Amino acid sequence: MTDISEKLDPLVDYIMKNCLWQFNSRGWDRLKQNAGILSQTCEILCGEEPVHETAMDRCYWVDAVILSRAYKARFPWLMAMTKPEIKSLFKALHEKIDHLTVHGSLNTELTVPHY
């Protein structure tokens, strides 16, 4: 697996099929959740300890722990990657998930300002 899309696609597929947090009803909430969960998942996979001081940090941290465990179990090649490679992959993953769940979504409810 040398092409980033070969690594990215199964990670995206897992989130889209198994993670309910991607379905928040407001676009800005989805963006915050994506950033919080994916950044903490990346930190965990890089052997770092995510900051979880606030209630929202802890909420994202729980989902990040679950996602990192699933990724380690299903995609053992992740653990053979270097920290910079993991961070680069997760940057691309974050961009792809933001596009699929918010920016490229046809769900007009995501942009209702009073919702």
Curated annotation (Swiss-Prot):
Q: What is its EC number?
A: 1.18.6.1
One GO term under biological process is: nitrogen fixation
A Gene Ontology molecular-function term?
Answer: iron-sulfur cluster binding
Q: What class of enzyme is it?
A: oxidoreductase
Q: Which UniProt keywords apply?
A: ATP-binding, Iron, Iron-sulfur, Metal-binding, Nitrogen fixation, Nucleotide-binding, Oxidoreductase
Q: Note the InterPro entries from the entry.
A: Nase_Fe-Fe_dsu (IPR014278), V/Nase_d_su (IPR004349)
Q: Which top-level group of life is the source organism from?
A: Bacteria
For this protein, the record's Pfam families field holds: AnfG_VnfG (PF03139)
So which cofactors does this thing need?
iron-sulfur cluster
Q: Determine if NAD is one of this entry's keywords.
A: no
Q: What is the protein name given in its UniProt record?
A: Nitrogenase iron-iron protein delta chain
Q: Coding gene? A: anfG
